[in-house]
Amino acid sequence: MSTLLSFGEVLIDLLPVGHSGLVHEPIPGGAPANVAVGYAKLGGKSHFAGGISADHYGVMLQDALAAQGVDVSCLTVVPDAATATVLVSLDAQGERSFSFNRQNTADMLYREADFDAIDWSQIDIFHLCSNTFTEKAIFTASLYGAKKAHKEQTLVSFDVNLRLSLWQDTRLLSARVEQCFGYTHLLKMSKEEALYLALERGGSFDDYLAFCIAQGVRLILVTNGAESVLCHSAEFSFELPVPKIVAIDTTAAGDSFVAGFLFELGRDEGYFTPGPLVQKLLNRVNVQTAAEFAIKCGAITCTTKGAFPALPVLAQVQS
């Protein structure tokens, strides 16, 4: 089984309680934290790296990660910074909208030296998102981590995961996201995100997929809500159906999909070293197997409110 290091923000999702929208419950979340927990709950060896506060919420988050089986030894505690929070609203279909409180919070203060302290020989997969690209210092650190992982022959997984409200200047967004492509083996985007980035470059959806591959991306996974998932590489391109479900909360569905794909991809113990794991992305059968597993994970997650509690265990996916 491959070992995952997921990097980025771990924060508090303030989820609505009842129908008034006035009462909210603090729930652990953050896209890369969800991926780390999802991977661990399926049975994988999972680490999480990022900045975390010493405040009440920070302690709660660290305990929550550890309780789900995530190794938290790569966390950097930032004593004088607060924990980021996000106010989550859900519509009738379970789709989300977000309002972030993330000014100088602990998750924004992870630096290059923190990556240097990690024993990369123990890591097979490095995962990150673009939510740590919004300000220059944390973007520089994030890109440094991706470069370091790539140099160490670690599979680099990048979920674009755009949250436009986090960006003070969205003109910087596409350039920063695209700088990461040269160090990315596996790229995950929603169809909406891909169309946004394609428009920024003045091209079509298909043009943008070709651009990503030309930058060195080995495999692109494009999700589209209840529609089919696209698996695209230089060698193949195909779509897989998504099961029809009644969605209660889609908060961590994409993260569950990523965790499931990475887990299934690296599941054969004693066989895959970092090099062959990257090469496995080029095999259509392997990709289809992992993507079908990932789709089940995402669908199950939509049927429960919250993030960590909604992420499935292996028995749920196999049943």
Predicted segments, located by residue:
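Cofactor-binding loop segments of dinucleotide-utilizing enzymes, especially the Rossmann-like FAD-
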Residues: 9, 50-54, 161
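Short, conserved phosphate/pyrophosphate- and ester-handling motifs at nucleotide-, phospho-/glycolipid
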Residues: 39, 190, 254
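Residues at secondary-structure transition points
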Residues: 23-30, 56, 171, 203, ...
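Positively charged, low-complexity intrinsically disordered leader regions
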Residues: 1-19
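Substrate-binding N-lobe of the ribokinase-like
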Residues: 20-95, 102-109, 319
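Ribokinase/PfkB-type carbohydrate-kinase core domain
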Residues: 1-5, 66-67, 72, 95-238, ...
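Conserved phosphate-binding/catalytic region of the ribokinase-like
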Residues: 1-5, 147-148, 202-319
